């Protein structure tokens, strides 16, 4: 088991390893002293792990209540958020009680935002069950729901009390969902760690789960510790995301987040090569490694539709847009471009 300490406004530990769900009651009791726990999950994850977690927490002395919703991004809405707040109030949760988010990124984002706002803030614990959530969304305190106008447009920075990444849960993931998480794993190598990217290129999907997840969490820790509120270098973690969010929205969220980010990284790296910011060999290597992991390389969406959807992104500021660009493996930067130039960037990335 690997332990990583996150030193932000609220310090907490991230544990990565096998069998953590079996010990969740003891580990949660160390940080949450209240009487009641609300387990928030989607219907898919609940069917796999919900009853076992509920029993473990009940046996550990907690009064457990649960809230589930249909799996998928389409549930990360004001309506689901409102129902969750009502559930917490109706079950009498107080500020000394705790929410446990059991699931992927949608579950963590929604449960975290409810924790941040219910009674002006109660404790919550992240138990991510997808690779993507383990290496990205469960760490760093970003919580949010979607609005009709765009993704993650209502949210808060609110750190969890604990994160438990049980690698055993990865065995139940559909292949496509696991590969989604690989897009975020590869992002860390491209941004920060050429040695990690070399190892992933060699090992492919056989990579050691605990080692790689732990390394990604360490890299995320470094970014979050330096810039908790996403005003500077933490923005590098958005590599591929501005275009990726545009692809997700333009595709009516029928394209998964990981697949969209993978396409976003391809498009931006190709555009960087076309604009002279990186060597074409760098863009081609990124594409080749994404290919090794079976991540998509094409979209039938045109540059205009992607751009229109991307312009609602939070990284827009007036008539400019912040775009994370790749100059080399391990060397990325934030470029501010006019919003009317974004379509040309996307077109350049699509046309190569």
Show the residue positions of the predicted features:
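Active-site segments that bind and position negatively charged phosphate/pyrophosphate groups
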Residues: 198-305
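Short glycine/serine/threonine-rich phosphate/pyrophosphate-binding segments
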Residues: 106-113, 134, 246
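A glycine/threonine-rich phosphate-anchoring loop and its flanking beta-alpha core
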Residues: 15, 113-203
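Solvent-exposed alpha-helices and their adjacent loops that cap or buttress functional pockets
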Residues: 92-94, 117-118, 146-147, 154-158, ...
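C-terminal charged capping/lid subdomain of soluble metabolic enzymes
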Residues: 183-185, 277-352
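ATP/NTP phosphate-donor binding region
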Residues: 1-97
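Generic secondary-structure signature for well-ordered alpha-helical cores
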Residues: 58, 159-163, 168-175, 183-195, ...
């Amino acid at each position: 088991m690997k332990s990583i300490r996150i030193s932000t406004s609220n310090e907490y530990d991230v544990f990565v390893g096998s069998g953590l769900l079996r010990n969740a009651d003891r580990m949660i009791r160390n940080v949450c002293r209240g009487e009641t726990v609300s387990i928030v999950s989607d219907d898919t994850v609940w069917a796999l792990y919900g009853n076992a977690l509920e029993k473990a927490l009940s046996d550990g002395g907690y009064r457990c209540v649960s809230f589930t919703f249909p799996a998928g991004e389409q549930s990360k809405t004001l309506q689901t958020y409102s129902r969750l707040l009502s559930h917490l109030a109706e079950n009498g949760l107080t500020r000394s009680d705790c929410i446990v988010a059991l699931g992927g990124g949608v579950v963590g984002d929604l449960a975290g935002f409810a924790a941040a706002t219910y009674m002006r803030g109660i404790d919550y614990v992240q138990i991510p069950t997808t690779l993507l959530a383990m290496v990205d969304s469960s760490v760093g305190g970003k919580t949010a729901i979607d609005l009709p106008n765009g993704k993650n447009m209502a949210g808060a920075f609110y750190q969890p009390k604990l994160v438990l990444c049980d690698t055993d849960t990865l065995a139940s993931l559909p292949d496509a969902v696991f590969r989604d998480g690989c897009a975020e794993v590869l992002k860390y190598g491209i941004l920060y760690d050429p040695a990690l990217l070399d190892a992933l290129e060699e090992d492919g999907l056989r990579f050691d789960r605990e080692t790689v997840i732990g390394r990604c969490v360490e890299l995320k820790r470094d970014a979050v510790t330096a810039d908790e509120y996403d005003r500077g270098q933490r923005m590098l973690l958005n590599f591929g995301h501005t275009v990726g969010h545009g692809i997700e929205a333009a595709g009516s969220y029928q394209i998964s987040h990981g697949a969209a980010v993978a396409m976003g990284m391809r498009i931006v790296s190709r555009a960087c090569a076309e604009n002279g910011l990186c060597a074409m060999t760098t863009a081609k290597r990124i594409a080749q490694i994404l290919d090794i992991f079976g991540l998509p390389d094409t979209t039938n969406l045109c540059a205009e539709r992607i751009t229109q959807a991307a312009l609602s992104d939070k990284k827009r500021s007036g008539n400019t847009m912040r775009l994370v660009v790749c100059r080399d493996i391990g060397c990325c930067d934030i470029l501010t471009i006019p919003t009317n130039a974004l379509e040309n960037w996307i077109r350049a990335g699509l046309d190569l």
